Structure formats: structure tokens, C-alpha cells
Amino acid sequence: MISITKDKRMLGYESLSSYSNISHFVTTRQGGCSEGNYASFNCTPYSGDEAEKVRRNQTLLMEGMSQIPEELVIPVQTHETNYLLIGDAYLSASSQQRQEMLHGVDALITREPGYCLCISTADCVPVLVYDKKHGAIAAIHAGWRGTVAYIVRDTLLRMEKEFGTSGEDVVACIGPSISLASFEVGEEVYEAFQKNGFDMPRISIRKEETGKHHIDLWEANRMQILAFGVPSGQVELARICTYIHHDEFFSARRLGIKSGRILSGIMIHK
């Protein structure tokens, strides 16, 4: 990944950085004002952090973007597969109605300029998508529950339906999240992936010393992207494990649920 800001509070992807008509970012733990398990650059308001500190961090975030957004669209995620189209219905809604629309949403899609689609993670997989032909974008939260339920595949299919998106026009980025080496799971999680048709030898291992399964969420989501027809060269992986690099990125497995979140965002310029 590349640094967007000098203090490295915001990183970016090389593939997306080559397009001048969009902005994107992935936040780190550096350069903010939050404290404790939220230290220091937590921009997510639904994590238990002090509201004023989140607002100050969001101001710093927007100052680091190449264009100030009309809105940071940040859903209240629930590990489901619900998506929201940021279109006429959302744009005509009141602030309160928008908050209600964003509750229980784990994927956002739009072609509207100026609205920064954001996803909050702390070990789960953030996926950013850009359809360079139709000028459409998506931000997807793929925890293990979303991954096993094919949220990335389904979001791409919704983009196909809404915008005409096809695989050859997509650039997709898989962000900092828990790695195969760190993601130990129980039998019930392994069986859920197996039941839903995943290639288990490709996305999992069993550690001899513990007898425990480990799942590769990066590969499980990359396979969904490739299955949509996206060329492998247009899929970028950060390959950064949040559990290992918890000093740089938030990790719920390390810090607990009451902790900060990585914010990944993408926006079409006005």
C-alpha cells in the first residue's frame, strides 16, 4: 500500500490511485486524537469512542482527501449481506431517515459523485470496488459471516444489475484484515464454508500443533471477485494482517470489541 498523507494516517492502493476521478483511503491508528483502545485515528462513530473525538478525526480524514466529500456515508454494520444503493431515495431523505437507511447495511454502491462510501473493520475484510467504465463504486464489509454468505459476489451482481458492471471493467482491492495464519476458527465456521461450496483446500489449513482450522478470508473473497470475471491483475491485496500489525491497525481480536475501527472509503469526484 502507499501513503496518502505524510503522517501515514491514511493509506491507499496503487491500482486505485492511478484514477484521477476518484478518491479512496484506508485509515491506520496514527495521527488522530482518540485515546486508549481507540488510539488514535478512529473515525467510526459506532464503536463506543467519544463523539467529539470521532468528529475531530473525521475532519482530519477529509482534510487528507483530494476532494472534500458531501458526506462520509458510514453504515451500522451487522455482519449480514444487506446492501444500500446511494441514489435518489437516499439523497432525498432527511438526516434521520438516512441514519435509519444505513442501519444493518454491510455493502454500499453508488454512481453519485461526492458521497464517500465507507466501511468499518477491525480484522474483517474491507473490499473497495471501482467500475472504471460506468463510473460506479462499492465498499463492502466482509467478515467471515459475510464472506461465507458471498457478500462480495452478491454486491458485484447488484452493480451489474444497477449499472451494467462487468468483470473486465472492475478494479477491486482487499484491505488490511486478519490473515490465514492468525484466523483460527472452530469446526462450526469451517463447516459453514464447506457447506456453502468453498474450495476448502484452497482457503484453509489445519495446524498440526493445535489441530485447529485456519481460514484464508483474503483468498475466499478474491475467489468471489475472480468468479465475477475480474482479471487477476485488477485485484489488489494489501496483504497486511491486522492481528499481527495491531500497533498500526485496529484489531478486535487483540483489543476487544470496544475499540477503534479501520475506515476504508471510496468516492467519485464531483
Curated annotation (Swiss-Prot):
Q: Which domain of life is it from?
A: Bacteria
Q: Which SUPFAM superfamilies does the record associate with it?
A: CNF1/YfiH-like putative cysteine hydrolases
Q: Which cofactor does it need?
A: Cu(2+); Zn(2+)
Catalytic activity reported: adenosine + phosphate = alpha-D-ribose 1-phosphate + adenine; S-methyl-5'-thioadenosine + phosphate = 5-(methylsulfanyl)-alpha-D-ribose 1-phosphate + adenine; inosine + phosphate = alpha-D-ribose 1-phosphate + hypoxanthine; adenosine + H2O + H(+) = inosine + NH4(+)
Q: InterPro entries, per this entry?
A: Cu_polyphenol_OxRdtase, Cu_polyphenol_OxRdtase_sf, Cytotoxic_necrot_fac-like_cat
Q: What EC number(s) does its UniProt record assign?
A: 2.4.2.1, 3.5.4.4, 2.4.2.28
Read off the Pfam families from this record.
Cu-oxidase_4 (PF02578)
Molecular function (GO) terms for this protein are: adenosine deaminase activity; copper ion binding; oxidoreductase activity, acting on diphenols and related substances as donors, oxygen as acceptor; protein homodimerization activity; S-methyl-5-thioadenosine phosphorylase activity
Activity over temperature: Optimum temperature is 52 degrees Celsius. Maintains more than 80% activity at 55 degrees Celsius.
Comment on pH dependence: Optimum pH is 4.5-6.0. Maintains 80% activity at pH 4.0-7.5.
Keywords, sorted A to Z: Copper, Hydrolase, Metal-binding, Oxidoreductase, Transferase, Zinc
Q: Is Metal-binding one of the keywords UniProt gives this record? A: yes
Q: Which PANTHER family match?
A: PURINE NUCLEOSIDE PHOSPHORYLASE LACC1, UNCHARACTERIZED PROTEIN YFIH
Q: How does it assemble?
A: Homodimer.
Function description: Purine nucleoside enzyme that catalyzes the phosphorolysis of adenosine and inosine nucleosides, yielding D-ribose 1-phosphate and the respective free bases, adenine and hypoxanthine. Also catalyzes the phosphorolysis of S-methyl-5'-thioadenosine into adenine and S-methyl-5-thio-alpha-D-ribose 1-phosphate. Also has adenosine deaminase activity.
Name this protein carries in UniProt: Purine nucleoside phosphorylase BT_4389
Say which species the protein is native to: Bacteroides thetaiotaomicron (strain ATCC 29148 / DSM 2079 / JCM 5827 / CCUG 10774 / NCTC 10582 / VPI-5482 / E50)
